[in-house]
Protein backbone atom coordinates (compact mmCIF):
# COMPACT_ATOMS: atom_id res chain seq x y z
CA UNK A 1 0.00 0.00 0.00
CA UNK A 2 2.84 2.38 0.81
CA UNK A 3 4.28 2.01 -2.71
CA UNK A 4 0.88 2.82 -4.23
CA UNK A 5 0.75 6.17 -2.43
CA UNK A 6 4.26 7.11 -3.58
CA UNK A 7 3.38 6.62 -7.25
CA UNK A 8 -0.14 8.04 -7.11
CA UNK A 9 -0.11 11.43 -8.89
CA UNK A 10 -2.42 13.00 -6.31
CA UNK A 11 0.09 12.41 -3.47
CA UNK A 12 2.96 14.91 -3.20
CA UNK A 13 4.94 13.19 -0.49
CA UNK A 14 4.64 10.37 2.04
CA UNK A 15 6.20 11.02 5.44
CA UNK A 16 6.53 8.59 8.31
CA UNK A 17 5.95 10.15 11.72
CA UNK A 18 7.86 8.42 14.48
CA UNK A 19 6.64 10.62 17.33
CA UNK A 20 3.30 9.67 18.83
CA UNK A 21 1.85 13.12 18.14
CA UNK A 22 0.75 13.73 14.58
CA UNK A 23 -1.26 16.96 14.42
CA UNK A 24 0.91 19.13 16.67
CA UNK A 25 4.15 17.93 15.10
CA UNK A 26 6.35 20.63 13.54
CA UNK A 27 7.18 18.22 10.71
CA UNK A 28 3.70 18.82 9.32
CA UNK A 29 3.02 22.29 10.71
CA UNK A 30 6.38 24.13 10.76
CA UNK A 31 4.92 27.63 11.05
CA UNK A 32 3.87 29.10 14.39
CA UNK A 33 0.23 28.65 15.28
CA UNK A 34 -1.70 31.90 15.64
CA UNK A 35 -4.98 31.40 17.48
CA UNK A 36 -7.66 34.08 17.44
CA UNK A 37 -9.45 34.48 20.77
CA UNK A 38 -12.25 36.91 19.97
CA UNK A 39 -9.87 39.32 18.26
CA UNK A 40 -6.84 38.72 20.49
CA UNK A 41 -4.09 36.87 18.64
CA UNK A 42 -2.19 34.24 20.63
CA UNK A 43 1.03 32.71 19.31
CA UNK A 44 3.94 33.73 17.15
CA UNK A 45 5.12 37.19 18.18
CA UNK A 46 1.81 38.04 19.86
CA UNK A 47 1.88 38.39 23.63
CA UNK A 48 -1.30 37.37 25.41
CA UNK A 49 -1.65 38.63 28.95
CA UNK A 50 -4.46 36.89 30.81
CA UNK A 51 -5.27 38.18 34.29
CA UNK A 52 -8.10 38.27 36.78
CA UNK A 53 -9.36 36.93 40.09
CA UNK A 54 -8.87 33.35 41.22
CA UNK A 55 -12.58 33.08 41.81
CA UNK A 56 -15.57 35.12 40.73
CA UNK A 57 -17.32 36.38 43.87
CA UNK A 58 -19.39 39.37 42.71
CA UNK A 59 -19.97 41.65 39.74
CA UNK A 60 -18.32 44.58 41.54
CA UNK A 61 -15.25 42.51 42.42
CA UNK A 62 -14.72 41.23 38.87
CA UNK A 63 -15.45 44.59 37.23
CA UNK A 64 -12.95 46.39 39.48
CA UNK A 65 -10.26 43.81 38.81
CA UNK A 66 -11.02 43.77 35.06
CA UNK A 67 -10.60 47.53 34.79
CA UNK A 68 -7.30 47.33 36.70
CA UNK A 69 -5.82 44.49 34.68
CA UNK A 70 -6.93 46.08 31.40
CA UNK A 71 -5.24 49.35 32.42
CA UNK A 72 -2.10 47.33 33.23
CA UNK A 73 -2.06 45.81 29.73
CA UNK A 74 -4.01 42.56 30.03
CA UNK A 75 -5.93 41.64 26.90
CA UNK A 76 -8.04 38.81 28.36
CA UNK A 77 -9.91 38.37 31.65
CA UNK A 78 -9.79 35.11 33.59
CA UNK A 79 -11.87 34.21 36.56
CA UNK A 80 -13.00 31.00 38.18
CA UNK A 81 -16.75 30.55 37.98
CA UNK A 82 -16.33 26.89 38.96
CA UNK A 83 -13.55 26.08 41.43
CA UNK A 84 -12.04 22.62 41.88
CA UNK A 85 -11.31 22.25 45.58
CA UNK A 86 -9.72 19.48 47.59
CA UNK A 87 -12.29 19.87 50.35
CA UNK A 88 -15.99 19.42 49.62
CA UNK A 89 -16.60 22.08 52.30
CA UNK A 90 -14.60 24.82 50.55
CA UNK A 91 -16.10 27.48 48.28
CA UNK A 92 -16.71 25.81 44.91
CA UNK A 93 -17.41 29.00 42.98
CA UNK A 94 -20.64 30.66 41.90
CA UNK A 95 -21.09 28.31 38.95
CA UNK A 96 -23.34 29.54 36.16
CA UNK A 97 -24.03 32.75 38.09
CA UNK A 98 -20.28 33.40 38.05
CA UNK A 99 -20.21 32.78 34.31
CA UNK A 100 -22.99 35.34 33.85
CA UNK A 101 -20.94 37.84 35.87
CA UNK A 102 -17.93 37.26 33.62
CA UNK A 103 -20.11 37.80 30.54
CA UNK A 104 -21.50 41.06 31.96
CA UNK A 105 -17.99 42.32 32.72
CA UNK A 106 -16.91 41.36 29.20
CA UNK A 107 -19.73 43.53 27.83
CA UNK A 108 -18.53 46.45 29.96
CA UNK A 109 -14.77 46.14 29.32
CA UNK A 110 -14.47 44.37 25.97
CA UNK A 111 -12.05 41.82 27.47
CA UNK A 112 -12.51 38.26 26.17
CA UNK A 113 -13.14 35.84 29.04
CA UNK A 114 -11.25 32.74 30.08
CA UNK A 115 -12.65 30.30 32.63
CA UNK A 116 -12.24 26.65 33.52
CA UNK A 117 -14.67 24.02 32.30
CA UNK A 118 -15.13 21.40 35.00
CA UNK A 119 -17.95 19.26 33.64
CA UNK A 120 -19.11 18.05 30.23
CA UNK A 121 -22.60 19.10 31.39
CA UNK A 122 -21.60 22.71 30.72
CA UNK A 123 -20.08 22.24 27.24
CA UNK A 124 -22.94 23.96 25.41
CA UNK A 125 -23.08 27.03 27.65
CA UNK A 126 -19.28 27.40 27.58
CA UNK A 127 -19.24 27.07 23.79
CA UNK A 128 -21.83 29.84 23.64
CA UNK A 129 -20.37 32.26 26.22
CA UNK A 130 -16.67 31.65 26.91
CA UNK A 131 -14.01 33.02 24.56
CA UNK A 132 -11.18 30.72 25.68
CA UNK A 133 -12.16 27.51 27.47
CA UNK A 134 -9.63 26.50 30.09
CA UNK A 135 -9.05 22.85 30.92
CA UNK A 136 -7.34 22.58 34.27
CA UNK A 137 -4.64 20.22 35.44
CA UNK A 138 -7.17 17.81 36.96
CA UNK A 139 -8.97 17.33 33.63
CA UNK A 140 -5.90 17.25 31.37
CA UNK A 141 -6.32 13.50 30.95
CA UNK A 142 -10.11 13.34 30.97
CA UNK A 143 -10.06 11.88 27.47
CA UNK A 144 -13.83 11.78 26.99
CA UNK A 145 -13.99 15.50 27.79
CA UNK A 146 -11.03 16.24 25.50
CA UNK A 147 -12.73 14.46 22.60
CA UNK A 148 -15.88 16.52 23.15
CA UNK A 149 -13.81 19.73 23.20
CA UNK A 150 -12.50 18.73 19.80
CA UNK A 151 -16.00 19.10 18.40
CA UNK A 152 -16.36 22.71 19.57
CA UNK A 153 -15.55 25.83 17.60
CA UNK A 154 -13.75 27.53 20.51
CA UNK A 155 -10.08 27.87 21.41
CA UNK A 156 -8.97 25.66 24.30
CA UNK A 157 -6.39 26.56 26.96
CA UNK A 158 -4.93 23.26 28.17
CA UNK A 159 -3.04 23.34 31.46
CA UNK A 160 -0.37 20.77 32.18
CA UNK A 161 -1.54 18.14 34.63
CA UNK A 162 0.12 17.54 37.96
CA UNK A 163 3.26 15.47 37.36
CA UNK A 164 2.32 14.95 33.70
CA UNK A 165 5.19 14.49 31.28
CA UNK A 166 5.46 16.77 28.27
CA UNK A 167 4.53 13.85 26.04
CA UNK A 168 1.36 13.18 28.08
CA UNK A 169 0.47 16.86 27.87
CA UNK A 170 0.96 17.03 24.11
CA UNK A 171 -0.99 13.79 23.67
CA UNK A 172 -3.88 15.41 25.56
CA UNK A 173 -3.76 18.26 23.04
CA UNK A 174 -3.76 15.65 20.28
CA UNK A 175 -7.07 14.26 21.60
CA UNK A 176 -8.67 17.67 21.08
CA UNK A 177 -7.03 18.19 17.70
CA UNK A 178 -7.81 14.69 16.42
CA UNK A 179 -11.50 15.35 17.12
CA UNK A 180 -11.40 18.45 14.90
CA UNK A 181 -10.36 21.49 16.97
CA UNK A 182 -6.80 22.60 16.24
CA UNK A 183 -7.10 25.79 18.31
CA UNK A 184 -5.27 24.50 21.38
CA UNK A 185 -3.02 26.64 23.56
CA UNK A 186 -0.72 24.89 26.05
CA UNK A 187 -0.36 26.58 29.45
CA UNK A 188 2.39 25.72 31.88
CA UNK A 189 1.68 27.82 34.94
CA UNK A 190 4.51 27.03 37.30
CA UNK A 191 7.82 25.26 37.55
CA UNK A 192 7.20 21.96 39.38
CA UNK A 193 10.73 22.02 40.80
CA UNK A 194 10.20 25.06 43.04
Residue ranges: model-predicted function:
Residues 47-53, 75-79, 113-116, 131-135, ...:
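Hydrophobic faces of well-ordered beta-strands that scaffold small-molecule active sites
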Residues 64-80:
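Catalytic domains of carbohydrate-active enzymes, especially glycoside hydrolases
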Residues 81-85, 139-194:
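Conserved anion-binding
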Residues 1-49:
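Non-catalytic terminal accessory/regulatory regions of metabolic enzymes
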Residues 78-96:
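Glycine-rich, proline-tolerant flexible connector loops at the mouths of alpha/beta enzymes
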Residues 91-115, 148-155:
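Alpha-helix-loop-beta-strand connector modules within alpha/beta enzyme cores
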Residues 2, 58-66, 121-129, 166-172:
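Catalytic cores of alpha/beta
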Residues 47-64, 88-93, 112-116, 137, ...:
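Active-site mouth loops of central-metabolism enzymes
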